[in-house]
Amino acid sequence: MPHHPSGLIPDPAFSRLVAEVRACRICAPHLPLGPRPIVRGRPSARLLIISQAPGKRVHETGLPFNDRSGDRLRGWLALDRETFYDEARVAILGMAFCYPGSDTKGGDLPPRPECAPRWHDRLRTYFSAIELTLLVGSYAIDYYLSGPRARSMTEVIVRWRDFLPQLFVLPHPSWRTTRWLRDNPWFENEALPELRARMAQVLSATPQVEPVPPQKISAAPGSRIGR
């Protein structure tokens, strides 16, 4: 492969892969609103957010986290919409790229299991400049922190210091998290300030000449991050 001074794979190859993702129809029979794969980011991105799956509003608008959950997440991260949606700095992947539908209680169904194994590694190969990955919600955490995890989501998130500086784990920012936030004030009082400080370093940093390839990053024992 030719050497590129930036250390990044040329954009046209990445653009072809994104077009392939957006043309994916593998899960079409299972999607009540039909497929609309949503993925954002460019090879220059330094922050990677891996979350659950698009909700109905996101499916309609084509913009990830374009809903109340997104408002809460941006509040946690202290990012305005302009920065959050700057694909040159922030990449966003769901564990599934299409809206999976809703359950009988009105909540979203789990992400389709076909999506992440098929696409994530291929996409992350191009995100060689990533310095911080956020795992948002149980589906992303369970997938990327492979192997036995603690008995509860709280026991995973409370270990946030163990995952820095390359990885951070968060609950999903849906309305269901409101009670959890009340019961766990340390998250907003201790964890989020540290996360915001790390993000400020990442998003303001000058790009490296040779970013470390993803497969050489070691984030945490048993982690898929860096594979």
Please give the residue ranges for each predicted region.
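A polyanion-binding, active-site-adjacent surface
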Residues: 2-203
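Cationic, low-complexity basic patches in intrinsically disordered or flexible, solvent-exposed regions
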Residues: 211
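Polybasic, lysine-rich low-complexity intrinsically disordered segments
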Residues: 216-217
